[in-house]
Amino acid sequence: MAIIQLGSTCVAQWSIRPQFAVRAYYPSRIESTRHQNSSSQVNCLGASKSSMFSHGSLPFLSMTGMSRNMHPPRRGSRFTVRADADYYSVLGVSKNATKAEIKSAYRKLARNYHPDVNKDPGAEEKFKEISNAYEVLSDDEKKSLYDRYGEAGLKGAAGFGNGDFSNPFDLFDSLFEGFGGGMGRGSRSRAVDGQDEYYTLILNFKEAVFGMEKEIEISRLESCGTCEGSGAKPGTKPTKCTTCGGQGQVVSAARTPLGVFQQVMTCSSCNGTGEISTPCGTCSGDGRVRKTKRISLKVPAGVDSGSRLRVRGEGNAGKRGGSPGDLFVVIEVIPDPILKRDDTNILYTCKISYIDAILGTTLKVPTVDGTVDLKVPAGTQPSTTLVMAKKGVPVLNKSNMRGDQLVRVQVEIPKRLSKEEKKLIEELADMSKNKTANSTSR
């Protein structure tokens, strides 16, 4: 090991695999430096054995990103320097806290920050930090090393090489067996979200136009009450699948002229769960049973055939802690025999006599709001469309806005006339010819 002084900074370098420790340089604190075969040993005050620094000195800074398998840093390389983690602050306990207090603090924080409960982006990283702190402070040997030398002291601890920590979800499972429906690394990897459920709701024309609140009965898969969703027979515990080693997947290899091809498949022995268990007699190992449930559904005004309403979380239950699916209600509207719908407009066709078309009239027109009087002006031509404003369908999710009702006028021409009617029409025709002739002569 060589000591290189850079201004007020000391850099300790070990052979060809460098590690860095940065701190303020105090020459008076170094007792002696002995050179042996191009490597050096530095003794510092305050340490029980030869080491770089004691935990009681200034904060120890270590270079991150360096591992035993990495090459020495190149010139100009950029490094991230971080301070030692304060495990006591992480758990919110004092340095004199008892094991019971440390455990209680960990349990409380782990529940709050477990990724299956807390969906914040930084929750999982915080959960790992809490687990690492508890792993150190709950172990007498590791806690003693940490109190004396900080994180650097843990790197040399037996079973704790390079500062590695246990999987935080395994640690959680050891203290919270069965908590929250089985959270942890295994259940997280095996969790299966529930599928969506679909329901067809039939409405009449007016119900679709104005909306309504209706109680419906749906059928869906719910968590089995006998096994609490685990799929295992009560009183039994699942064992690791020997086929896939608990991974839930197996790899098959096939040699071809082009090389060896590998394929990852779901383990058929455990169906991807990684565990083998005695199946529950109620749900046959699925963890779910089909049940019916009545829910109140609010249908907004303006829906039409093909509209889909989404009710979150009311679909089929998930497996092994998976999220439930959603309920999709598909609308089907029974057509009205008289009124037709065109988006937000309503179409209606009426017939009037040629006399009414000539002289004008008032009609009784059916609408979704009831029967309304419609004035047909004199001289209305065949196929004229009259507009009844705001008598149409409300705009979906904007019930204060409505379409119109469009009334198409058909003028009926009689095929047969009585003698009197024919005579009057002929007189009318003569009058029309005379009127036309007079206007032309002028």
From Swiss-Prot:
Record has Nucleotide-binding as a keyword: no
Residues involved in Zn(2+) 2 binding: 241, 244, 267, 270
PROSITE patterns for this protein: DNAJ_1, DNAJ_2, ZF_CR
CXXCXGXG motif repeat positions: 224-231, 241-248, 267-274, 280-287
Highest taxon above the source species: Eukaryota
Pfam families, per database record: DnaJ, DnaJ_C, DnaJ_CXXCXGXG
Induction: Induced by heat stress.
Location(s), subcellular: Plastid, Chloroplast
Protein family: Belongs to the DnaJ family.
Protein name: Chaperone protein dnaJ A6, chloroplastic
Organism whose genome encodes this protein: Arabidopsis thaliana
